[in-house]
Amino acid sequence: MSNHPLLQCINLCKRYQEGQLHTDVLRNVSFAIEPGELMAIVGSSGSGKSTLLHLLGGLDSPTSGEVIYQGRSLNQLSSTAKAELRNRELGFIYQFHHLLPDFTALENVAMPLLIGGSKPAEAQEKAHEMLAAVGLEKRSKHRPSELSGGERQRVAIARSLVNNPSLVLADEPTGNLDQRNADSIFNLLGELNVRQGTAFLVVTHDLQLAKRMSRQLEMRDGQLQHHLTLVGAE
């Protein structure tokens, strides 16, 4: 096993400029994620959590600073290389599942594999395995409209893991769910972490759910606090 972090960000800054006005969304954010780690970043709306996740996933570029994933600087990668990295090595989960409405659960989960060049039969077999891993093997032929909110988010989790990523970035994955389903989703993330060794970085406003992760950080006004407080928690 490598002694290097799975992902590291160094002095990340993100500034949005409009004419003479500017907004500093992130200010000198630095931290690392270890292989197999369960980490939560807690913060209120507008604190910079989602912007940070976009930078870590190569969906946006920092104004300054650097993101290093498994020894590779995202700043040095082309757009094509970043897209390939996202497809093959990173998983993403969002507050809203973003499932394709005209496709079944199985087809939605298989989609990243097909985009990556897998044969249809192989993609379907792997998608079946992942749906079974999240407890939805009997719902594989259902479309999103035929699934509950919790089930749709489980499909989204299966889709994020189908390429066996080393790291999954989750942006408020339980924000659109009731407490029972939110608890179930967090339990599932923990189970998948143990079973598959996948690292998860979850950004959330829910302190109680975040405390169930192995490490918690707090985002305040674009800066990362390497401790967690009860201030502003819901």
UniProtKB/Swiss-Prot annotation:
Keyword flag Nucleus: no
UniProt KW Cell membrane keyword: yes
Topology in the lipid bilayer: Peripheral membrane protein
List of residues binding ATP: 43-50
Gene Ontology CC: plasma membrane
Keywords: ATP-binding, Cell inner membrane, Cell membrane, Membrane, Nucleotide-binding, Translocase, Transport
EC number: 7.6.2.-
Localisation: Cell inner membrane
UniProt domain ABC transporter: residue ranges: 7-233
A Pfam family assignment: ABC_tran
PANTHER family: IMPORT ATP-BINDING PROTEIN (PTHR24220), LIPOPROTEIN-RELEASING SYSTEM ATP-BINDING PROTEIN LOLD (PTHR24220:SF689)
Subunit structure, interactors included: The complex is composed of two ATP-binding proteins (LolD) and two transmembrane proteins (LolC and LolE).
Function: Part of the ABC transporter complex LolCDE involved in the translocation of mature outer membrane-directed lipoproteins, from the inner membrane to the periplasmic chaperone, LolA. Responsible for the formation of the LolA-lipoprotein complex in an ATP-dependent manner.
Family statement: Belongs to the ABC transporter superfamily. Lipoprotein translocase (TC 3.A.1.125) family.
Name of the protein in question: Lipoprotein-releasing system ATP-binding protein LolD
Source taxonomy: Bacteria, Pseudomonadati, Pseudomonadota, Gammaproteobacteria, Enterobacterales
